Amino acid sequence: MIRRHLLPRLLPLLPALLAGWPALALAQPVPPRPVLSRPAPGPVRIVAGPGGGCIAGAVELPAEGVGYRTIRMSRSHFWGHPSTVTALQILGARARAAGLPTLYMNDLSRPRGGPMSVHASHQTGLDADVSLDLSPKYPLTPAQRDALDPPGLVAPDRRGVDPARWRPQHVALLRLATGLPGLDRVLVNPAIKRQLCLDATGDRGWLRLIRPWYGHAAHMHLHFRCPADQPECRDQPPPPPGEGCDASLQWWFDQLDVPPPPPAPPRVPPPLPPFCQALLGVQR
């Protein structure tokens, strides 16, 4: 029993004494997050488009759910419109039902949207990156999940997929993605689109929504249409008709033989809408 007159001397030492006992250690106060690291309060409001907008009232994708888990969590890029979060949860559940491995969810948007250093879009809560790594998944520590960098599927010459990594299940996953509610398009590397054109059987209408774009060798980029209740949101033109397995796809590979142009001057993005500037403050 500790004598009462000794307690004042022992209290400052308690955190060190209990450090090896997680259940007993004194909880350290967590400082409040800066305002801009939290979503703006109030109803959901999307302003402008994915390359120059913002979102108020965003919700966060849970770190784990049926058929998925998030990675690189310290970036806090898992915020989006409620319909985007629901669609990703649907994708995880459908992937699980189809017998696919757990999916890794990567970036959505910042808590209030707006520009991101690693993306040109992802600004309005309507974009999400989903890893194409379909290897078996195992428990990871938080540090491992934060540092995870799944491998790409494209061969070094960029003209096709890596046969050691490409699987029939990739066709199934990408087809599942095109059936999500509100989906506008899925961006993948041109080599992945080319392989889908070769492998897809039966009804191939879903290929129209798979669009080739630079990069995107290790993940698919899901872009969702503006929700009907967001009049200030700006949609992109819809994908052109057809499967997209024609000369328009071949163009991407023809460019591999063209010498790269001289570096262009840095592009200065247009100013954000006034609402977004006020919402984001110093983020802009």
Q: Where would I find each of the regions flagged by the language model?
A:
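Bacterial N-terminal signal peptides that target proteins for export
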Residues: 2-14
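N-terminal signal peptide c-region/cleavage motif recognized by signal peptidases
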Residues: 20-22
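Boundary at the C-terminal end of the N-terminal hydrophobic targeting segment
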Residues: 25-29
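Catalytic cores and adjacent binding grooves of peptidoglycan-active enzymes
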Residues: 30, 140-284
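Extended, low-complexity, intrinsically disordered C-terminal regulatory tails
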Residues: 33-36, 87-118, 187-209
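Active-site acidic/histidine clusters and adjacent loop/turn architecture
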Residues: 40-106, 166-175, 183
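Extracytoplasmic
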Residues: 98-100, 123-127, 217-219
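Short, surface-exposed glycine/acidic/tryptophan-bearing loops
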Residues: 117-135
